[in-house]
Amino acid sequence: MLNALYPLLRPALFSMDAEDAHHFTLNNLMRAKRMGLAGCIGNSIADDPRTVMGVRFPNPVGLAAGLDKDGAYIDGLAAFGFGFIEVGTVTPRAQPGNPRPRMFRLPQADALINRMGFNNGGVDAFIRNVQASRWKAEGGVLGLNIGKNADTPIERAADDYLYCLERVYPHASYVTVNISSPNTKNLRQLQGASELDSLLSTLKAAQQRLADQHKRYVPVALKIAPDLDDDQVRNIGDALVRHKIDGVIATNTTISRDAVKGLPHAEEAGGLSGRPVFEASTRVVRALREVIGDALPIIGVGGIFSGADARAKIDAGAQLVQVYSGLIYRGPTLVRECASALRR
């Protein structure tokens, strides 16, 4: 039902502040779920399983991190038919993020700009929400995305990632290490060669220790930016292979404004997502695949607004895809459309 209604609902949602609309929609999704109206919300899960990173994904279309930062809406979002859901980014301690307003629509470009700043309730509250959801207990694939607190010096970033990794590990299907948000000061420095080498070495050792402790291996993926030149992509790819990281998510939002110059809100600080990031993110997927070969899988994300867009990510070298901004603009029908386009 929501597939048909969303085009009618969208003007009302888009008349609201973007962040207010976000929370309004998610709260009502959960309300519908609790009332037993899940069948009216969206789609059944398309059965098109893929095994990636050693995990069986019911289908290759997932939700990107950022929509549900605290893991509070997992069961409502599950009704959209995703093959996997990624929640977060979560940090060790609760933090408010950046001052509002901090999310802006650019409807002329099917785009969003956000400078949320990892607003979240902290990893302990995050885990309680994850444990309360039925999605994982019922076999759903759940990615948990971790970051660092804004007031943690970049030199101590590894401490925050380790803290979060140790706490989310028992509850995750996979863990994503987010070093590519443009909204936490200096975070993208961790994509530099020496910084990345040190971080990945530390995290890989912790992953192996946690696997022994919990008698279960949970894969770790790295989320990278689209604003990378060929040398940077090569350095990152080499580091991923060298440290035997399980996967890579390409990409996060862009700081470029080339595709939206002159549009209202185009000069707002933050990360740009939506259609304008599609080409840049797909270029990184393709370049990364050339560097890493078949050593590890890529999850392609950035500007997917159609089944053809999802197929283009796969053709560029991704094994799975994720959506976010396209879901805001197109509604849950996008999930079914992408799953159909990728069906084998």
Swiss-Prot record:
The protein's name in its UniProt record: Dihydroorotate dehydrogenase (quinone)
EC number(s) recorded for this UniProt protein: 1.3.5.2
GO CC annotation, single: plasma membrane
The keyword Membrane appears for this protein: yes
Family, as annotated: Belongs to the dihydroorotate dehydrogenase family. Type 2 subfamily.
Transmembrane segments: none
Keyword terms of this UniProt record: Cell membrane, Flavoprotein, FMN, Membrane, Oxidoreductase, Pyrimidine biosynthesis
Signal peptide: none
Positions annotated to bind FMN: A65, G66, L67, D68, K69, T89, N145, N178, K223, T251, G274, G303, Y324, S325
Localization per Swiss-Prot or TrEMBL: Cell membrane
Residues at the active site: S181 (nucleophile)
Annotated cofactor note: Binds 1 FMN per subunit.
Sites where the protein binds substrate: K69, N114, R115, M116, G117, F118, N178, N183, N252, T253
Keyword Heme assigned: no
Disulfide bonds: none
Subunit description: Monomer.
Cofactor(s) annotated in UniProt: FMN
CDD domains: DHOD_2_like
Topology in the lipid bilayer: Peripheral membrane protein
Domain of life from the UniProt record: Bacteria
A Pfam family of this chain: DHO_dh
Metabolic or biological pathway: Pyrimidine metabolism; UMP biosynthesis via de novo pathway; orotate from (S)-dihydroorotate (quinone route): step 1/1
GO biological process: 'de novo' pyrimidine nucleobase biosynthetic process; 'de novo' UMP biosynthetic process
